[in-house]
Amino acid sequence: MIPALIVPILNQPELLVKMLASINQPVEQIIVIDNGRAIGESHPPLVGCGVEATTVHLPCNLGVAASWNLGIKLTPHAPYWLIVNHDIEFGLGDLARLEEQIDPREAGVWLIFGLAAFAITRHTINAVGFFDEGIHPAYNEDLDFMRRVDLLGLPRHEVGFTGTHVGSATIHSDPVLRAANGFTHAANDRYYERKWGGPKLGGETFSTPFNRGGHMGDWRLDLETLRANAWPRR
């Protein structure tokens, strides 16, 4: 049984319903982080593989990294977490392969479909640290995490994926959010470059965050960044 599944959402709850319906392996806990009041009080119960999801309703967009971190903190006893985008639909056998391949005693990352659907263990978090909430509200938090994974020499396991992924569904469905992302994505690129001494995907020069020689989980939550990068409420 998959111990915990975490999925943030900002809009398009119909895609979330499809994702949950595609879960074809038992899951102990499903945590939905609702960042945009997408799931109203009158919405039918969210169910995946017979398990009713716990929905955390937030008054504003916490951001991807903070949502993933919150899901982990809400299920601290889980040996591992499956973290997914709401616009994924799993294929038959995808989650069964994950259960066959994952070793909760190991630190690493199990990639079902890149960082749109992946699993990490408590040992991964202990080694790598939590997701960097200074990257807000979305884009680059996955690259930053995998940069730390790779620097520590932790393995990437390719589980395989036979399902479907819409891709960037949140911003493509809303021109206001798409415009806001144009600003915040560039701001997150600049933050990433400060943190790693160069641009993402090959230009990095630092081997520790901010070249400070500390733990890989070294990051700073900056209130000014949260204010500047906040997307409009929808």
Per-region residue spans from a language model:
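Short, well-formed alpha-helical segments that are part of the catalytic scaffolds
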Residues: 11-25
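A conserved acidic beta->alpha catalytic loop
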Residues: 22, 32-45, 88-89
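Short beta-strand/loop segment that forms part of the nucleotide-sugar
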Residues: 28-37, 56-58
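Conserved donor-nucleotide/metal-binding helix-loop-beta segment in metal-dependent transferases, i.e.
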Residues: 95-109
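C-terminal catalytic/acceptor-binding lobe
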Residues: 137, 143-234
